[in-house]
A protein has these predicted regions:
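A structural motif corresponding to the C-terminal lobe/cap of the Radical SAM core domain
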Residues: 99, 108, 124-149
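Conserved AdoMet/S-adenosylmethionine-binding subsite of the radical SAM
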Residues: 1-113, 118
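Radical SAM enzyme core and accessory elements
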Residues: 152-154
Length: 154
């Protein structure tokens, strides 16, 4: 990233934010990285820590702490939310994410990414069970509702 910035190339970090900690050596390396990062794209899957754990195997505490850290340092951030019917599309989750985002001043954009099944073959080729194989993509109305709740702008 440093070389990119030195050569006038914009830099974007696309992350789920899971490994965040304020402990070194991670934090000092992250601080250096943030000095050379123009924008962070952060995925927020679920606002409830236990539902997030059920979905990903980890709670979201590190992710939310990372978002707060980015806000503290004034790093511009885009939030992306994968909308999975029956998993991440309920009103409680969407309104909870919106309430969290309202505590941050550095969010420049919010995007809803509708769940799709295009990558199932990757899981199958690795012999990993794909637990969402019976989930259909969200309808256009469901996506629109989520975008309205989350305050997405086109």
């Amino acid at each position: 990233f440093r070389l990119a910035k030195e050569n006038g190339v914009g830099t974007v970090l696309d992350t789920a934010g899971q490994p965040f900690t304020r402990e070194d050596p991670f934090f000092s390396k992250l601080t250096d990285l943030m000095e050379n990062t123009d924008l962070v794209m952060l995925d927020l899957k679920h606002i409830d820590p236990e539902k997030h754990r059920a979905l990903t195997g980890h709670t979201n505490e590190n992710i939310l702490a990372f978002a707060r850290y980015l806000n503290e340092i004034g790093k511009p951030m885009w939030i992306r939310h994968v909308l999975v019917p029956g998993v991440t599309d309920d009103n409680e989750n969407l309104h909870g994410i919106r309430a969290f985002l309202d505590t941050l001043s550095n969010v420049k954009k919010v995007e809803v990414l509708p769940y799709h099944t295009l990558g199932i073959y990757k899981w199958e080729s690795l012999g990993i069970p794909y637990t969402l194989k019976d989930v259909d993509p969200p309808t256009a109305d469901t996506v629109k509702r989520a975008e309205e709740i989350l305050g997405c702008s086109k």
